[in-house]
């Protein structure tokens, strides 16, 4: 079944910030931590936080010591004052958009204005906003309630940040008709507006809409309401288990969106479950092709064959005579390391890629055995190439295995917070890129050949740069799961925006280096052709940034496809040069 996923389906800025603050604090493991009220309205996320030792309290007397986090919805000023006087360490995770509305209300009510808040009376955000009204605030939730606003000279309007934009506009018109001098403020969050617009854009494009989010989440329920009012068959689900597969099976294209407090892994689970539903029009052959491709991707065979293709391209770039031994060595080593490290580090994949985690559980024996025999095969091939290469591959294999294993004794961990190599911030991306570069470009220098060092070094830098970009891009896709388990990958250390900026610079520098090497005759003119690989990676970055594709099977396959592009260019160069 085809799925059209909304570009805006993910945590909003405020929820993401609150989650990052809480998880970062929880991963430090320094004392107890609680949130003052549920951090966000999503049962699965709250359960996750509880598994990390983060509890939720509603009364300050329930918490005596430790760190207390103010929820994303914000709280009234009298509660904030009480928390400050409690002596507890406070972390303010109030959404910045909510804080702006609080400031508007506080400022104008002090000037003698009466605040009209358009929102849900019982919602925590609205309760907090009322507290800033200095006794001069009223809440309304419909056009009918405009007539109940007390007569007053100075009025201003604000909205709960997750309100329906069209409804707010209608209420503004009604209030302006009664209070012509009323001040109005656009306080609905951009993320909320964009989600609502995208729901309406589904009209005529999809057969039905699935909205993923908590049953008690106000903004999620509003998306459901907007979808229903647009005349679209609408299904509100919390998890993939809530899907009505029987009804969905009669449809062809399903639109999927999610509330602002719905994490990526829940959206992925729902999307994958919908995609797995067989429609009446789907052919056996088409389904077989799709399943075969997915098997290649989930089993890491796709990235391994990508390594094969990249090794062939690197041999042509460095001036070596292309053969099958070196690409096969790369294929076997890369497959073994990816598979075995998946089993050694299962935590983050549960959240980053639930489908792959499930695949690994189902095919555990096959994958472990195939990974083990791939390593044996890599060692056998390396021995054929010489004892020096054999020991080099053995060393790389040992480093690859211990990457995910604790190497610092428990008794010494109080002196050094990183017990594993992978715990070192940013080490994952760097380690993968170095391993690929050494394996594909530098190991051949240990063989008794007349390979030129400058060409080999350039080949190493080419492989290192594109593998680094690939690994960092996957780290961006997987940031939520890594944050949950406490892995400090590059995007967590630098932030997504800076990481993407860094990747663009790496692509630019790599392209300039290839061009310079071709101009100075360090390598042959084939390097001009490889500029297409950097262009293709740039396209992948743009596709992600513009949200033309959501992180998932198709985008991952597109990223991995860059290695095959390099191999194809090398093959074409051999044929036609």
Question: Where are the regions that the model predicts?
Answer:
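Short juxtamembrane and helix-loop transition motifs at transmembrane-helix boundaries
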Residues: 287-294, 351-361, 417-420, 486-495, ...
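Transmembrane alpha-helical segments that form the membrane-embedded catalytic/substrate-channel core
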Residues: 332-344, 395-410, 438, 462-477, ...
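Extended hydrophobic alpha-helices typical of membrane-associated regions
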Residues: 356, 421-422, 527-577
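Intramembrane alpha-helical segments
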Residues: 358-447, 541-550
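The feature marks the mature, well-folded catalytic cores of soluble enzymes
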Residues: 1-258, 262-265, 271, 275-279
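Solvent-exposed interhelical
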Residues: 338-372, 465-509
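The first (N-terminal) embedded transmembrane alpha-helix
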Residues: 294-317, 370-373, 432-440
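Helix-coil boundary and interhelical linker segments in multi-pass alpha-helical membrane proteins
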Residues: 309-329, 378-391, 441-461, 515-526, ...
């Amino acid at each position: 079944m085809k799925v059209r996923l909304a570009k805006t389906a993910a945590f909003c800025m405020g929820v993401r910030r609150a989650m990052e603050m809480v998880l970062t604090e929880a991963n430090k493991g320094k004392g107890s931590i609680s949130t003052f009220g549920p951090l966000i309205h999503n049962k699965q996320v709250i359960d996750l936080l509880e598994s990390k030792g983060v509890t939720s309290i509603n009364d300050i007397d329930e918490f005596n010591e430790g760190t207390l986090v103010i929820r994303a919805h914000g709280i009234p000023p009298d509660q904030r004052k009480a928390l400050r006087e409690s002596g507890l360490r406070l972390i303010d995770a109030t959404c910045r958009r909510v804080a702006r509305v609080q400031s508007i209300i506080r400022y104008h009510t002090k000037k003698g204005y009466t605040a009209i808040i358009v929102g849900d009376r019982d919602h925590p955000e609205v309760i907090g906003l009322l507290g800033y009204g200095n006794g001069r605030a009223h809440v309304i939730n419909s056009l009918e309630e405009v007539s109940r606003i007390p007569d007053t000279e100075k009025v201003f309007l604000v909205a709960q940040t997750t309100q329906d934009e069209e409804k707010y506009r209608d209420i503004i018109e009604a209030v302006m008709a009664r209070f012509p001098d009323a001040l109005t403020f656009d306080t609905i969050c951009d993320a909320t507006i964009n989600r609502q617009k995208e729901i309406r854009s589904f009209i005529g494009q999809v057969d039905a809409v699935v909205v993923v989010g908590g049953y008690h989440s106000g903004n999620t329920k509003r998306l459901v309401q907007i979808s229903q009012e647009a005349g679209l068959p609408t299904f509100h689900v919390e998890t993939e288990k809530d899907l009505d597969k029987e009804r969905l099976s009669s449809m062809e294209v399903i639109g999927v969106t999610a509330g602002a407090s719905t994490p990526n892994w829940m959206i992925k689970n729902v999307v994958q479950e919908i995609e797995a539903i067989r429609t009446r029009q789907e052919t056996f052959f088409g389904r077989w092709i799709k399943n075969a491709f997915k098997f290649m991707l989930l089993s890491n065979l796709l990235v391994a064959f990508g390594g094969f293709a990249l090794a062939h391209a690197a041999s042509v770039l460095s001036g070596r005579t292309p053969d099958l031994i070196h690409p096969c060595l790369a294929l076997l080593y890369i497959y073994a390391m990816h598979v075995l490290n998946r089993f050694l580090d299962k935590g983050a994949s549960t959240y980053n890629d639930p489908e792959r985690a499930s695949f690994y559980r189902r095919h555990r024996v096959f994958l472990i055995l195939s990974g083990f025999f791939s390593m044996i095969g890599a060692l056998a091939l390396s021995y054929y190439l010489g004892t020096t290469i054999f020991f080099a591959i053995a060393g790389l294999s040992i480093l690859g295995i211990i990457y995910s294993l604790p190497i610092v004794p428990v008794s010494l961990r109080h002196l050094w917070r990183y017990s594993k190599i992978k715990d070192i911030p940013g080490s994952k991306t760097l380690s993968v890129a170095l391993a690929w570069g050494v394996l594909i470009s530098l190991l051949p220098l240990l063989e008794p050949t007349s390979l030129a060092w400058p060409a080999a070094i350039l080949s190493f830098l080419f492989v290192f740069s594109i593998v680094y970009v690939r690994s960092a891009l996957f780290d961006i896709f997987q940031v939520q799961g890594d944050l949950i388990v406490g892995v400090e990958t590059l995007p967590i250390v630098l932030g997504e925006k800076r990481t993407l900026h860094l990747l663009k610079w790496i692509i630019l520098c790599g392209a300039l280096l290839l061009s310079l090497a071709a101009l100075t005759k360090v390598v042959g003119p084939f390097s001009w052709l490889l500029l297409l690989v950097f262009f293709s990676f740039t396209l992948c970055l743009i596709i992600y940034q513009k949200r033309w594709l959501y992180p998932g099977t198709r985008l991952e396959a597109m990223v991995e496809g860059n290695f095959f592009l390099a191999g194809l260019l090398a093959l074409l160069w051999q044929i036609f040069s």
